[in-house]
A protein has these predicted regions:
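Conserved beta-hairpin
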Residues: 9-23, 38-39
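C-terminal/domain-terminus segments
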Residues: 76-85, 140-168
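Conserved acetyl-CoA-binding loop-helix of GNAT-fold acetyltransferases
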Residues: 65, 71-87, 95-96
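Conserved acyl-donor/pantetheine-binding loop and adjacent beta-alpha core of acyl/acetyltransferases
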Residues: 23-62, 80, 100-133, 138, ...
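Short loop/turn motifs at secondary-structure junctions and domain boundaries
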Residues: 2-6
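Short loop segments at secondary-structure junctions
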Residues: 16-18, 28, 68-69, 162-166
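Short beta-strand micro-motifs in enzyme catalytic cores
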Residues: 9-11, 56, 153-159
Length: 168
């Protein structure tokens, strides 16, 4: 359904016909005054329920690269494709709930916000959030209850990339 609804905003990387990475998303309204949400609140039950080409924000619903294909520039290229889509369509930017897998090692010693702050400051490394920061995203706080992952207290981080071609 996603490929038919918003093909210009969804990307699959192939190696000899085999999918090895993907970046998926939809266009949404996003209320920055009320950022707490679960992914299904954004996508709806069918994954595209709240998508409209008229909405101003690209919401990154999923991005992944098979482990054996990591560190080859595929993830960076997927983010570039998303940014290119946003620029081409004249959208405000990209919003997503970013997973913070490294928080599992610190959950007993600090809050999710403290962990995010330390990653942003460069004091801790998170395999996902650090990569997102290196790709121009800002961390804008914790999203509690975003996903069902007790190892990180069901927390995620709100990440935002603002299109520099669009004035606020």
């Amino acid at each position: 359904m996603l490929a038919e609804t918003f093909p210009e905003g969804n990307f699959v990387v192939l190696d000899e016909g085999r999918p090895v990475g993907m970046g998926l998303g939809i266009l949404v309204e996003f209320d920055f005054a009320h950022t707490s949400h679960a992914l299904v609140d954004i996508t709806g039950e069918n994954g595209v329920e709240h998508h409209s080409i008229d909405h101003p924000w690209y919401y990154g619903t999923d991005i992944s690269v098979y482990p054996e294909y990591r560190s080859r520039g595929i993830g960076r290229r997927l983010y570039e494709l998303r940014k290119d889509c946003v620029r081409r369509l004249g959208k405000r930017g990209i919003v997503a709930g970013g997973v913070i897998p490294g928080y599992a090692d610190h959950i007993d010693t600090m809050s999710a916000q403290a962990y995010i702050d330390k990653v942003v400051a460069g004091e801790l490394y998170d395999p996902t959030l650090t990569f997102q920061l290196e790709n121009g995203f800002e961390a804008r706080g914790v999203i509690p209850g975003y996903l069902d992952d007790p190892t990180v207290g069901n927390n995620s981080v709100l990440i935002v990339w603002e299109n520099p071609d669009i004035s606020s």
